[in-house]
Amino acid sequence: MSSAYLASLACPRCQRDYPESAAFTICPACVDEGQNVNPAPVYDLSRLGPGWQPDRGQPGVFAYRDLLPIAATTVPVSLHEGSTPLVPAPALAERLGLGELLIKDESRNPTWSYKDRLAAVGVTKAREAGADTVVVSSTGNHGAAVAAYAAAAGMRCVVLT
């Protein structure tokens, strides 16, 4: 089971809808046509309501757990990613003719990359599925992030470069 607000998975290429519990990561209809396309989540955000707030009692990106494809009973793998600061950049704002410019400082994440957000959810989902190993293809930040989160989860990690 996943997010209460996840309605389905939809293929952006062929527009087919699949149940959110589908046990595949590539659209079967497109694979039959020689195309590898990942279905994207379709959320029913109308069910959130105007008073919805992130759950600040959850670590990192899991404050937004209601919107993530993670079962309510799954313990998240988090290194307290996210909640990175916005840093004012007045000189650059002036040079660009902007009244104000804020730059998100993602180097404050555990592996110094915004990829930590994806790694936290991906490794949590892998553990939820019963995996003991995660495998990724990366030449940099994504591999480092997944390796860190896999280690935190007690899982093996293979990074293909």
Where are the regions a protein language model picked out?
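PLP-dependent amino-acid enzyme catalytic core
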Residues: 1-161
